[in-house]
Amino acid sequence: NLTDWNNNLVFETNVIPYRKNRYRGNLLFARNAENGRGLFFLKEAPGSGVQLAYGGGDFTAEFGDFTVTGLGVTEKDLREGEWVKAYGCVLGVWSGGELEQLTALRSYQKNLRKLLPGRDEMVMMNTWGDRSQDTKVNERFCLAEVRKAAHLGITHFQIDDGWQVGKSPNSAVAKGSFKNIWDNPDYWKPDPEKYPRGLHPVVELGRELGVEICLWFNPSVQDGYADWEKDAQALVGLYDEYGIRTFKIDGLAIPDKRSESNLRRLFDRVLERTGGQVVFNLDATAGRRGGYHMFNEYGNIFLENRYTDWQNYYPYWTLRNLWMLSKYVPAEKLQIEFLNKWRNTEKYAGDPFAPANYSFEYLFATTMAGQPLAWMEASGLPEEALGIGALIERYKEVQHDFHRGVILPVGDEPSGRSWTGFQSVDGERGYLIFFREQNPDRKARIETWLPENSKVRLTPVLGSGKAAVQKTGRRGTLEVELPAPNDYTMYRYELIR
């Protein structure tokens, strides 16, 4: 996590346990090489660097003995007669190879929160990615954005910081604060100067055009979220009045167990009062937050802030982060951004991996294994960009079916010049996405999670692939052909017995 500062999100260590040693991380896999069986420990906690009461390690291993350490609780957190939730520990077992190992982990992760197509699947647009901050958001701007978003096939339009009466520290119009939010009882009401009729016109147009309106929200951080009940009521009030049920939760800081417990109370209360209809997009970009393995029952993860303005959006970087995480975190629980490639082209002058060197369709394709996030203003797109709507409409037809499977990385790690991709495994069927980055080879042999020496039918769904029947090679290898660099294809596959 802390993706504002980190761009390498997964680290793997492979050891033969010997004398007693400590290891850091959220996951430990242990395999018995004699019989091919194994177990895993999942520590349901933030990343090691931001855990509470951290003792310097998460696991100890000594020959065949393994221990999970670090409850995230000290004696100061205990209150007589009150239960205190420690960090969770999941123990799982498997038999077989790496696919069985990862499937065992994923079967638990997928059951933490049922992925409902009408609630959890989304192709979201959030205008903050164009760096206008809160200078543009008002009724007129949002109505225009919703119309264009509908043309693009967007399902959810999220109004970020600036819709509300209160001003945050990130405001470009009047520097505000997150401290003592409830000194202003109207802080979380629509700004009457920007939205004189409230959010009703925007919400109603969205319903008419099939675009769900979503909002940004920053819980009241002071005194360990002591005002969590007021925050919960504000969110429930927005749900009751406008039907808004998807909220980006930003600005979290969890310095102690009381803060963590009150945040859970906030999330639980909102889900209880809305019949489980609300989705929280939990921002993982900064601060002491939940990370990839905590609060997963509440929604999905807003993964990263990337901007062409600061030249830190590279399509292959975004693809790489999704590819690396997808082995251990459900890809369908990650919001993955694509940006307006026509902005700030001069800042990437001469850079072969500049966003402008890719088709807009390819940028969208890099997000398809996750929950796509159009991190941009629709009004800033040129006319040629609107053609992506046909691709997004076709993607939405298979989005949930793709996300139902166990999504795992295939091919080589994205580097800007690799053959790479994803596989969604669902029994004897599933999907494959292949990317030919700026690689000179028209064809590649790519290892997959398919069984060896098996006949498989490949049916193109999106992109540039051609229908084929192949027999897999060693490690499930398939031969893939794409006619040009920076191209992609999505196949539906089925094993032929």
What are these regions (language model features)?
Residues 1-106, 445-448, 455-456, 462-482:
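N-terminal accessory beta-strand-rich subdomains and adjacent acidic, glycine-rich linkers
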Residues 5, 117-121, 426, 452:
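A short, polar/charged loop/turn motif at coil->beta-strand junctions and beta-hairpin connectors
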Residues 46, 130, 220, 437-439, ...:
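Short, glycine-/Ser/Thr-/acidic-enriched flexible segments
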Residues 82, 86, 267-469, 481-483, ...:
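Active-site-proximal substrate-binding groove within the catalytic cores of carbohydrate-active enzymes
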Residues 92-94, 492-497:
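Short beta-strand-to-coil "C-cap" segments at the C-terminal boundary of structured domains/repeats
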Residues 100-148, 152-156, 160, 165:
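An acidic-aromatic substrate-binding cleft motif
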Residues 158-346, 357:
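Aromatic- and carboxylate-enriched substrate-binding clefts and catalytic-loop regions
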Residues 176, 487-494:
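C-terminal engagement modules used by replication, chromatin/transcription, nuclear envelope/ESCRT
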